[in-house]
Design a protein with these regions (language model features):
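Hydrophobic/aromatic residues located in beta-strands of well-ordered beta-sheets
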Residues: 6, 47-49, 95, 124, ...
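Short, structured coil segments at secondary-structure junctions
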Residues: 43, 67-68, 167
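Short beta-strand segments
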Residues: 9, 98-99, 128
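Conserved core of the sugar-phosphate nucleotidyltransferase
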Residues: 58, 105-184
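N-terminal glycine-rich phosphate-binding loop and ensuing alpha1 helix
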Residues: 3-51
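Short phosphate-binding loop-to-helix
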Residues: 53-116
């Protein structure tokens, strides 16, 4: 298997809770806590913040440098394009993706997503049974490329529909032990 990278999608443009990614818990930014959790994994070749070219996101690049991880700057609104270009830039074959405001994600599930990919070769692997704030996705670079070719919008902040509504991708939601599942 080629390189596996964790792409953290992050921007500073939140309006409901401004600058939420740099709010501190115990003197550490929320995004730094997430990075710490990702560093606990043995399966990742890269951890990358995928942010925008907007100057307000400079602080995220500074945090990436301080935390000794990489960053990529791309489109502000086209999240799929940003993910694809970041993965291509760092020569990733497989991507684990999470939004930066999910600092409590469990590294146990990183391994589960990758194991499922190795078994199923699914284009997208989801963890929808986990509580909100713990979701992560597994994506093949080749599937991202296909979405770039077929998408009809440049605002792809919500991009899952390209995988689930087109009927051209193999999508798998992994089994989550009952004790970790959310109650709807």
């Amino acid at each position: 298997m080629g390189k596996i990278g964790f792409l953290i999608t992050a921007r500073m443009k939140s309006t409901r809770l401004p600058k939420k990614l740099t709010l501190k818990i115990m003197n550490r930014e929320i995004i730094a806590w997430l990075i710490d959790r990702l560093k606990q994994s043995d399966i990742l070749d890269e951890i990358i913040i995928a942010t925008s070219t907007n100057p307000q996101d400079d602080i995220l690049c500074n945090i990436a440098e301080r935390e000794n991880i990489k960053f990529y700057r791309g489109s502000e609104d086209d999240v799929i394009e940003r993910l694809y270009q970041a993965a291509k830039h760092f020569e990733l074959e497989y991507i684990l993706q999470i939004t930066a405001d999910c600092p409590l994600v469990s590294f146990d599930f990183f391994d589960k997503v990758v194991e499922n990919y190795k078994e199923t070769k699914a284009d997208l692997i989801t963890t929808f049974k986990l509580p909100h704030g713990f979701f992560l996705y597994g994506l093949k670079l080749s599937a991202l490329k296909k979405v770039i070719e077929i998408k009809d919008d440049s605002d792809t902040e919500v991009w899952g529909r390209y995988f689930t509504e087109t009927n051209i991708f193999k999508v798998k939601d992994i089994d989550i032990p009952k004790k970790f599942q959310r109650n709807n």
